[in-house]
């Protein structure tokens, strides 16, 4: 009987650790649904668009802040952080970005390196290759708490 208790405890501990490893996988799988299209194919033609991040004098912005693309078009975003702070470029629909912004308020140090999202440090750059397979209006935003609200928001109109 004394041997059963340690074995049961070890089995429960192993199950808890396994469950802890599985939950983040499922959370990440749910994140693999992209509202604004899908990751691009580098073997196919694409247009290059540079988006510069600014945070001058307390104002935060993307330049350009609006982009029009054709459905099916691939865009290679070259994202340049010309500011003094770290910023993000998260491409999604407004609903998904607002939902993700709420998560960022809970976990403000979370960094992104996803097909549709990058964290870019000051004086650095990153790239996203994206295929806009759906019509509609989508947004790119910095979801670091307070940045979206300070103006770090742009629109992609897919026709």
Show which residues each predicted segment covers.
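Beta-strand cores of secreted/periplasmic/IMS beta-sandwich domains, seen most often
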Residues: 64-91, 126-134, 158
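Extracytoplasmic entry segments of secretory-pathway proteins
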Residues: 2-53
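N-terminal edge beta-strand
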Residues: 43-74
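Residues that flank catalytic or metal-binding motifs in active/ligand-binding sites
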Residues: 47, 73, 85, 116, ...
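Short beta-strand and strand-turn-strand segments in soluble, beta-rich domains
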Residues: 59, 105-114
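Short, compositionally biased
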Residues: 90-97, 144
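Extracellular/periplasmic metallocenter environments
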Residues: 28, 114-159
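Short aromatic-acidic-glycine turn motif
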Residues: 95-106
């Amino acid at each position: 009987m004394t041997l059963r208790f340690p074995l049961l405890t070890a089995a429960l501990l192993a199950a808890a650790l396994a469950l802890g490893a599985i939950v983040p996988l499922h959370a990440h799988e749910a994140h693999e649904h992209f509202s604004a299209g899908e990751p691009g194919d580098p073997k196919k033609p694409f247009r290059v668009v540079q988006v510069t991040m600014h945070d001058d004098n307390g104002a935060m912005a993307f330049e350009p802040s609006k982009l029009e693309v054709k459905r099916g078009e691939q865009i290679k975003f070259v994202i340049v952080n010309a500011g003094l702070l770290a910023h993000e470029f998260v491409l999604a629909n407004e609903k998904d970005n607002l939902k993700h912004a709420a998560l960022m308020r809970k976990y403000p140090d979370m960094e992104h390196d996803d097909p549709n999202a990058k964290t870019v440090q000051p004086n650095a750059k990153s790239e996203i290759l994206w295929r806009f397979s759906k019509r509609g209006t989508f947004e790119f935003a910095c979801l670091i708490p307070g940045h979206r609200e300070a103006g770090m928001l742009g629109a992609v109109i897919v026709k």
